[in-house]
């Protein structure tokens, strides 16, 4: 497995992996597939030196991706980022998400990050278990904030401090 910065030519595969996650209703509140065009601005908001998007390659195929997103976008939150991880169906349960999350934690200090957050549906047990296994703790609970196919779903906010202030 090779983790690298995403480049614009990866965007079509990033979108395809994201769209493949929608039908399960586990990982995103989007209900319909998103378009390549609708994700171009999102892609360009990321920077390899600040809020990167990484892809994980397995045998030259993109098996999954991770993005860092600014938390609330206000200056006082500059050292906090939300992370999102999506894995292609063929590569789920193969360690791709684990490798991406490990890399995110390891590289966070170099990105100026002290806190990582994950907003995870309460019924997404695989993701909750993954984040727990890396020492993330439950920092918040948002009851019934999403409605997926007529079912109200809760969000759990998982957090981890990466380095303490001196």
Model-derived regions: residue spans:
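A short beta-loop-alpha structural element at the N-terminal edge
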Residues: 2-14
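Conserved GNAT acetyl-CoA-binding A-motif
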Residues: 108-120
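Acetyl-CoA-dependent GNAT
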Residues: 8, 32-90, 101-102, 161-163
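Conserved GNAT-fold acetyl-CoA-binding loop/helix
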Residues: 15-42
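Glycine-rich acetyl-CoA-binding "A-motif" of GNAT/NAT acetyltransferases
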Residues: 61-65, 126, 152
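Conserved acetyl-CoA-binding loop-helix of GNAT-fold acetyltransferases
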Residues: 87, 93-106, 128-133
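Conserved beta-strand-loop-alpha-helix junction that forms the acyl-donor binding cleft
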Residues: 92, 118-128
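Conserved catalytic-core motifs of GNAT/GCN5-like acyltransferases
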Residues: 70, 75, 117-120, 137-154
């Amino acid at each position: 497995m090779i983790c690298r910065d995403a480049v614009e030519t990866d965007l079509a595969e990033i979108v395809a992996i994201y769209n493949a996650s929608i039908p399960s209703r586990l990982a995103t509140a989007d209900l319909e597939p998103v378009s390549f065009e609708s994700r171009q601005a999102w892609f360009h908001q990321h920077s390899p030196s600040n809020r990167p998007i990484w892809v994980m390659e397995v045998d030259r195929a993109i098996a999954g991706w991770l993005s860092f997103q600014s938390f609330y976008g206000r200056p006082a939150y500059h050292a906090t980022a939300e992370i999102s991880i999506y894995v292609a169906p063929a590569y789920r349960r193969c360690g791709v998400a684990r490798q991406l999350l490990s890399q995110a934690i390891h590289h966070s200090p170099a990105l100026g990050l002290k806190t990582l957050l994950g907003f995870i549906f309460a019924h997404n047990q695989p993701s909750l278990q993954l984040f727990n296994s890396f020492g993330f703790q439950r920092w918040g609970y948002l009851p019934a904030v999403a409605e997926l196919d007529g079912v109200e779903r809760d969000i759990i906010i998982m957090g981890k401090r990466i380095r303490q202030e001196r």
